[in-house]
Swiss-Prot record:
Protein name: Zinc finger protein 662
Source organism (scientific name): Homo sapiens
Residue ranges occupied by any KRAB domain in the UniProt entry: 1-44
GO biological process, one term: regulation of transcription by RNA polymerase II
Cellular compartments per GO CC: nucleus
Gene3D superfamilies cross-referenced by the UniProt entry: Classic Zinc Finger
Protein purpose: May be involved in transcriptional regulation.
Compartments, record wording: Nucleus
Zinc fingers classed as C2H2-type: ranges: 192-214, 220-242, 248-270, 276-298, 304-326, 332-354, 360-382, 388-410
Family: Belongs to the krueppel C2H2-type zinc-finger protein family.
Residue ranges crossing the lipid bilayer per the database entry: none
Length: 426
């Protein structure tokens, strides 16, 4: 029986008790209430908020006449208003779409004076400031599609089968939203409003799930791996990892991504955009994470420390690669010869031995190399650079391996002093 209360809640503009209304419904009678005499003169009952819809008694002139006026029934000496059967029998599937509500609200705003009229439901919707003095407590007035007031606007809505007042702290309230609430009430839909953010729900389950997000609860779990999320959209996006669906495709190279944010970052490769700039040196980066890692060069911060040897790194991937030296793990294996490597870059260079690919070419002589490090060593022949210097004799070399061989000669020339024989002599 309570579900019918939302349908007749539009009678709230007229003073009648809720228990009496429910009793009428239980007896199978058509709900009705007494119409104040002021309403027959086109006035809303005193003290009723302009933002809340109320039924228009028949016979009152309005800018847009309807074909079938509301039926009035006399009881005793005073007139009584019968709730239209069409409103009572309306179902959820007849709910007016939001776009239609917005268009209807825009049509209402052309009225310059008098009560605002909802033609589809034969309801008045608020009044203008010209009639402010006749309404007693007046929270605001319609102007250009918005509800404006110097005080708090009060909007009456249905929450959990009860009538409450929701105070809008801001000075402006979108009248389209008021019309949307009005239509949902007439279509037997109950609103559940979140007190934290003001978001509305027409399903109690959705309302309860939403409130848990404010408490930090992760109520949406992945059925594949059990990972939980606070928001349903995040859970849906995560499940694409398991399904392999990549709906976001780059129009330049056709590469697809699971997340839209990854596509945006990828597109910066094509555009060359680097929106994240270092304040210390002015260097730009395409990703914010890259900027954060770069800034550690200036600050000297190395938050990732190896537990085996104590060596620290600026990036976590660098620490993971370093730890393979202690564990001996070689996760990257060549499919041609089965040789394993600690780093993917080493595997890529090794595979060029099988493919014969030499992408690094010397600009001076045209000689090509498998890896860039070999090209750099070769170019020192042309430049004459010798960065490796012997500490014993000062001789310099272009390659570190040649320096090591040279230092072994100095080691052979130096006699070994036996500390034990020296002690025996004394």
């Amino acid at each position: 029986m309570l579900e019918n209360y939302g349908a007749v809640a539009s009678l709230a503009a007229f003073p009648f008790p809720k228990p009496a209304l429910i009793s009428q419904l239980e007896r199978g009678e058509t709900p009705w209430c007494s119409v104040p005499r002021g309403a027959l003169d086109g006035e809303a009952p005193r003290g009723i908020s302009s933002g809340y819809p109320f039924l228009k008694p028949a016979g009152i002139s309005h800018p847009e006449q309807v074909e079938e006026p509301l039926n009035l029934k006399l009881q005793g000496e005073g007139p009584s208003l019968i709730c239209p059967e069409g409103v009572l029998k309306r179902k959820k599937e007849d709910f007016i779409l939001k776009e239609e509500i917005i268009e209807e609200a825009q049509d209402l705003m052309v009225l310059s004076s008098g009560p605002q009229w909802c033609g589809s439901q034969e309801l008045w919707f608020g009044k203008t400031c010209e009639e402010k003095s006749r309404l007693g407590r007046w929270p605001g007035y319609l102007n250009g599609g918005r509800m404006e007031s110097s005080t708090n606007d009060i909007i009456e809505v249905i929450v959990k089968d009860e009538m409450i007042s929701v105070e809008e702290s801001s000075g402006n309230t979108d009248v389209n939203n008021l019309l949307g609430i009005h239509h949902k009430i007439l279509n037997e839909q109950i609103f559940y409003i979140c007190e934290e953010c003001g978001k509305c729900f027409d399903q109690n389950e959705d309302f309860d799930q939403h409130q848990k997000t404010h408490n930090g609860e992760k109520v949406y779990g992945c059925k594949e791996c059990g990972k939980a999320f606070s928001f349903r959209s995040h859970c849906i996006a995560h499940q694409r990892i398991h399904s392999g669906v990549k709906p976001y495709e780059c129009q330049e190279c056709a590469k697809a991504f699971v997340w839209k944010s990854n596509l945006i970052r990828h597109q910066r490769i094509h555009t060359g955009e680097k929106p994240f700039e270092c304040k210390e040196c002015g260097k730009g980066f395409s990703q914010n994470t890259s900027l954060t890692q770069h800034q550690r060069i200036h600050t000297g911060e190395k938050p990732y420390t190896c537990k085996e040897c104590g060596k620290s790194f600026t990036r976590n991937p660098a620490l993971l690669r370093h730890q393979r030296m202690h564990t001996g793990e070689k996760p990257y294996e060549c499919k041609d010869c089965g040789k394993g490597f600690m780093w993917n870059s080493d595997l890529s260079q090794h595979q060029r031995v099988h493919t014969g690919d030499k992408p690094h070419e010397c600009t001076d002589c045209g000689k090509s190399f498998f890896c860039k490090a070999h090209l750099i060593r070769h170019q020192r022949i042309h430049t004459g650079e010798r960065p490796y210097k012997c500490n014993d004799c000062g001789k310099a070399f272009s390659q570190n391996s040649v320096l090591i061989k040279h230092q072994r000669r100095h080691a052979r020339d130096k006699p070994y002093n036996c500390q034990i024989s020296h002690l025996l002599e004394h």
